Structure formats: structure tokens, C-alpha cells
Amino acid sequence: MNRDTSPDLHYLSGFGNEFASEALPGALPVGQNSPQKAPYGLYAELLSGTAFTMARSELRRTWLYRIRPSALHPRFERLARQPLSGPLGGINPNRLRWSPQPIPAEPTDFIEGWLPMVANAAAEKPAGVSIYIYRANRSMERVFFNADGELLLVPEQGRLRIATELGVMEVEPLEIAVIPRGMKFRVELLDGQARGYIAENHGAPLRIPDLGPIGSNGLANPRDFLTPVAHYEEAEAPVQLVQKFLGEHWACELQHSPLDVVAWHGSNVPYKYDLRRFNTIGTVSFDHPDPSIFTVLTSPTSVHGLANMDFVIFPPRWMVAENTFRPPWFHRNLMNEFMGLINGAYDAKAEGFLPGGASLHGVMSAHGPDAETCEKAIAADLAPHKIDNTMAFMFETSQVLRPSLQALECPQLQADYDSCWATLPSTFNPNRR
């Protein structure tokens, strides 16, 4: 069991484990899942994150032992205030970049502040990704669950205290959190306001990638993923329960807290990970390896090696390659790249890409270091140096990402993004090799 920065929070260590946790001694049944009478008069309930008949190594399910079953709720009604959504923007092959989105002035909780940026599938599809930027300036008083997909949260500003059915975790910038599809949770702001990124994964649950020839260690090590221990609320007071279903918000009112799980066991769990613990792999000879070596989590498809989504980071690291153009190379990619920046600067862009901002390079969209970065890299003294105080990341998808109407029409869209490559000179000389 691990203790995080908050003295009242404890975590279980590991990834893909069969965890077990109880807030009261003996609350977990012994030797079976659904006894006739569960300890303490609790109800047994199964939360399935995958189909029953998946391979055992890929199953995600958790047994919950709770004060009241989730079935105890009235009819859901569609909320008058709906999330920003609507049809995706028209076909647009251009490279796009956005400045940071402002945090709203009006009171906005976590689920009210989602700005849809890009997506590649409707919520009911069994694969695909929708990407948002969240902004909030007040804590949630209601409870939320997302029927449309698994949520990967990447804070850029402000710490979050996330109370889930399975326990409580705190997440700060340079950490991430993953919340399974359908799990109820509430987000409280520890710093007054918050901003960050969300990848809503409609496909196979995220997992750590295979390491191949890297071996048995490296990248995101399983022991650094932390799942909260059991914690329950026994409050009997009105609370709104909101669900996101096919992109819409529907709600009902309960007379009790739905975060009332006293004990649980299983593998369908929320977790957090500190990106500063990523064991970065890179060249110690020449050339710039493929960015797949920076993959933290992946959602696979049925095609081996082709991801529904990869979550990739560009952390602090030493650059030592000899006789090498060290920034990320110029590229035209089969995959689609949505990038964000948590802090510092990205080594391929000298200006214009700011923390809280974003960029989109779609399939076969030519991209690479800007003119200033390129000029400096060609002339650089190739002594070892460290890229420090930075954390950029990428959501990379196999299906084409299409920007939302809101993303295309917002004032933060940089109209002059293409100009960062406009002054790249031709240095070709057929008489000099």
C-alpha cells in the first residue's frame, strides 16, 4: 500500500491487477462473489468494463459491496443545459493549432467545462476517441458517470480531488488519472480553478504497451500506477446523479450518496500515474527513434500493432545522438496526432505552442520542427545536453480526427500556424555534398 502526498489517502500499487480493498474489516465476502447475505447488510453489484467472454488477461470487471444498489434511482431526465457538442466540422486537411482556452468567468464545474476539440467516432461506436479540453472554477456537488467511454484526464492547471465509487485520489499537473466507463465520480478543485485535457476512449480499455526488445523493464513501470483504497460516503441527502449518454447529459435526483461502496475486488478500477516516473528510452548512438518509445498507455485494435489510441509523452531527457538532427524529424504520418503541453516548451516548436494549448496534425499532414528550431539544430554543437522542465504529450489515433465546430470557430485557433514553416530555406547545392 502506498501513501501519496495527502496523509489521508492511500493507494494500491500495480497495473491490471486483481485488487481487493475494504473500508470495514470483513466487508469482503470470502470465497464467493454474491452471498445470500453479504457482510454488514451490503448489496453485491458487478461493474463490467469488458464482455464476459474476453480473454482472461483482457477482462475488466469489479465486484462492489455497497450500501444501496445502483438500480435504486428514479427516471433520468434530459438536462436543459447540455454540453457543448454537435456535428463535427467539415472536412479540413489543414494543420491546426490553438492557444490556451480561457477558464470561464461564470461558475463552472468539471462536467460543465468540457470544450470538444476533435473526435473520430460517434459515442455509440465500439472504437474511436473524442478529445476535450476541460475548464472549471468550482467543485462538483453532484456525481457523474460517463456511459460513452473510459476517461483519461491530463491536468495542466490545478489539482483535482477525484472521489470515485472505489475510493479517493488526488491528481496534480504532471500526473494523469483514468476513470473506467460507467464509474461514478465527483471532482473537487483543490486550487480554485483547473484546466486540462480529456481523452474519451470509446474502444478497448487502456493498457500499458508491450516492451518487445526493450525487455522486462522501462517506460511506464506497472508498480507506479496507483489505485485508491475503498472509501464510502453514508450521507442521506439529495444529490444529483448525471450521466453522459451518447453525448448528452441526463440526470436524476437521489436521496443518498451514490459513492457508497464499502468494499470491492476486481480489475476494473480507477488509477493515477505520475508522468515524472516514466523511464524514458532513447538513442545512445545516432538518429531519433520513433516516438512510439514514449508510449505510456495504449488502447489496441484487432489489428496487431495498430492502436485505437496511444497516449505518448515527451518528458525531460538527455540528447546525446552523434551526427544527428536531434529534434523530431519532418514527418507525414498514417496516424493522427493531437498534441498538448502541460508545462515548458516542446523541442520541435520554438514559439506559439503554449501550456494549455493544442495542435492537430491529421493523416498525411506534413509537419515537423519550425524554421527557427530547424536552423538551430543544423548548426548546433552536438555536445550532450538535457531537455528539461518540459512535458508535452500526444493522443495518437488510427482513425481520422475531425475538429469540432466549436474548435474551428473559437478565437484561440491560430490562423497563422502554417507560417512557422514558411521561412524554411532551400539549402540544396548540387556541387557540394
Curated annotation (Swiss-Prot):
UniProt pathway annotation: Amino-acid degradation; L-phenylalanine degradation; acetoacetate and fumarate from L-phenylalanine: step 4/6
Active site (UniProt): 288
A single GO molecular function term of this UniProt record: iron ion binding
Catalytic activity: homogentisate + O2 = 4-maleylacetoacetate + H(+)
Any GO BP: L-phenylalanine catabolic process
Cofactor(s) named in the record: Fe cation
CDD domains, per database record: cupin_HGO_N
HAMAP family documented for this protein: Homogentis_dioxygen (MF_00334)
Function, as annotated: Involved in the catabolism of homogentisate (2,5-dihydroxyphenylacetate or 2,5-OH-PhAc), a central intermediate in the degradation of phenylalanine and tyrosine. Catalyzes the oxidative ring cleavage of the aromatic ring of homogentisate to yield maleylacetoacetate.
Family: Belongs to the homogentisate dioxygenase family.
Protein name: Homogentisate 1,2-dioxygenase
Organism: Pseudomonas putida (strain GB-1)
